[in-house]
C-alpha cells in the first residue's frame, strides 16, 4: 500500500473515532442557592423554564454537592476532578501553585481531540493564562468591564487581549458559547460556561428584573433577574444543539459552585456600589449558607442530561459530587486516567441503571476550620471543636444533632474523616480556628441561638485589628472587604498598637477593581505622625484574581502603626501579614 494511503486511512480513523465521542458541556452558576430551580417547587417566585426542561430531559440530583462552600476551591475541584485540599487550594486566598501543576479535564479532553472553550468566571489565576489550563478558546466575561478573550461574540478568532463589554455578561457568555457550537458542530467539543450569577454585584438589566413584578426584596428581584438570564442562556445553548442535531450527542452538566450567601439576616441593602451581602438567592429548605459545610453551603443545584443515553425524568437519590464531572467526561471521551488521579466516579452507568449501588461509599470535605463526611444518610460535621451528627433521611434541614444518641456512629465517621484529612495538603481536620463569622453561623443555624445584630452602618469597629478610614471594612468569611465612602477619596485601612522591631516585611494578598498605585505607610515609635519618607509604593492592577505583594519596610526602630493604601475602589484582603524581617 502506498504511504500516502496509509496516512489517509490513519487520519480518517482518528477523525471517525473523534466524531464518535460525545460533546460535553459544563454549566456552572455562582452562589446559586438550592431552592432556585423552578422544577424543585420550593419557591414560587423563581422561573426557570429552560432549566426545568433540561431536568425533565435528564436527571435532577436530589443530593448533588460541590466540593467546597466557596468559589475558588470548588472550581479547583471541578476543573481537576481531584479534591482541592490535595493540592493546597483550600480557600479563596490560597496560592495557586498547586493547582497550576494539576492536569485539568480541559487538558485531558484537548489531548483526546476535543476543541475546548471557557466562558465567564475563571477565578483560578489570570484570565489571560486560561489557555495554559487546556482551553483553546477563551471568552472570560463576568462583568461589564473589559475582559480577556481570544474569540469574539460570534466565535471568531482574535488575539488574546482585553475586549470591551458590549452585552450583559450572562448573555455574552451564552451567545459566544452558541457561536462555538455552530463553529465546531462537526467535531467533539468541551465547553465550560461559568456564569457569574447570581453572585454579587447584582447587576441584572431592568428587562430581566421586570419579569418579576410584585412586592419582594429588591435583592431577591435582582437575583431572579440574573437567574432568568442564566435560564435564557441555557435555552440558547440547548436550542443551538437541537438545531444542529447535537442534542443526543451532547452530555450536559448544570451545577452550582456553592450555596447562597444569606449573611443570616438576608438584609435587603441597596444594590448600588455593594459587591457583597446577601445575593438574593435562597437555600430553602436547607440549613446554613455559603461559608459552611452545612447542607446550605454546598448542597447545590445539580442537573445532568444526555438524551438518548441517560433516561430522562429521573430524580437520582444517591449523593453525587462535582468531582464526578471530570471522571465521567474522561470515561465518555475514552481518556485513560492513572489510578488515583481522579477522586470522582463515572456517573453514566449509575444514571442508566446499570449499577444500582451508590456511586460513593462516602463523600468528604474539608474547608478552613470545618470538615464533614456523608456516608449514606449519616453526616458528621465539625467546626473547630464543635461536632454534629445528622440523619439526613429524616433531617435534611440539620436541626437535630444526634451525636450524643449515636456516639458509635459519630466515632466511626470521625475515624474515617480523620484518616482522609491526613492525606490532604496540609493534613488535619482543620486548618485553623473558627472565625467570629463562622461561630455566628454555627450558633444561629446549628445551635438555634438568636441571630447577632446586623452590622451597623457604617462599621467603625476594628476588624481583626484593622480600621477603615473614609470607608467601611467588614469581614466576610475569611476575607476583609473594604468599601469606600460614596463620593470620597483617600480611603485606606490602618492598624495601630503594633510592636514590630524593624526592618519589617509586609505581605498582603488582595484583589481590587481599580488600577493605580498602592502603598504601605508606617509610623515608628517616637514619631508623632506618618512621615512622607516612610512610605513604600507598589503597582496595582484591576483584577478579580488575587494579587500578592511583599513590601520591605526599612525601619530602623520599632514600627507601631501601619496604613495600607490601594487605588480608590472596592477591595478585598485575604492576607495582611506584618512581621520582623528575617535576619
Predicted regions mapped to residue ranges:
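Extracellular carbohydrate-recognition regions
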Residues: 440-472, 477
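Exposed low-complexity, polar/acidic, P/S/T/G-rich flexible segments that act as propeptides
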Residues: 568-583
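Hydrophobic h-region of N-terminal signal peptides that target proteins for export
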Residues: 8-17
